[in-house]
């Protein structure tokens, strides 16, 4: 059985801010692109961290997890009302990369477009010929014009 509090290395009474901070630290640490020499372990840990954050950052999911543990997370416990809404408490986990992008605001900070826009390079930096305007892309770590 996986203990989500242990995965994020936070106490059971941790605030949502502490959970957010722990996720940020561990998601950056275990991101598969930052661990090319140990990719399998990094992917496994990255998924665990994202799953733990999804449950513990949502008040309703966290309450169910605190009451019923992993069985609640898997939909095995519904608080004594088994037929009221059988899907109400089933947790569905998203792709860890989606959780990471949502948390960090857009692009993956570890993937860089080294070639840029090939048409922009060929046309001498002018996208107006293509009928497009340049847009800025900003992440918490980098801002591209």
Curated annotation (Swiss-Prot):
SUPFAM superfamilies: Chaperone J-domain. The keyword Chaperone applies. Keywords: Chaperone. One of its GO terms (biological process) is chaperone-mediated protein folding. The keyword Chaperone applies. It holds the Pfam family DnaJ. Coiled coil: none annotated. Expressed in sperm (at protein level). GO terms for molecular function: Hsp70 protein binding; unfolded protein binding. Residues 1-69 form the J domain. May operate as a co-chaperone of the male germ cell- and haploid stage-specific Hsp70 proteins. This is DnaJ homolog subfamily B member 3. It comes from Homo sapiens (Human). The gene is DNAJB3.
């Amino acid at each position: 059985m996986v203990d989500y509090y242990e995965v994020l290395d936070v106490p059971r009474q941790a605030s949502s801010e502490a959970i957010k901070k722990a996720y940020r630290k561990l998601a950056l640490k275990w991101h598969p692109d930052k661990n090319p020499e140990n990719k399998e372990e990094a992917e496994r840990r990255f998924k665990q961290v994202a799953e733990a954050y999804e449950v513990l950052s949502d008040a309703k999911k966290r309450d169910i997890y605190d009451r019923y543990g992993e069985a609640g997370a898997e939909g095995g416990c519904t608080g004594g009302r088994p037929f009221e809404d059988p899907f109400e408490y089933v947790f569905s986990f998203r792709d860890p990369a989606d959780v990471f992008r949502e948390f960090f605001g857009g692009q993956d900070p570890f993937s860089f477009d080294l070639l840029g826009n090939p048409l922009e390079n060929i046309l001498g930096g002018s996208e107006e010929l293509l009928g497009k305007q340049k847009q800025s892309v900003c992440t918490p770590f980098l801002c591209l014009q």
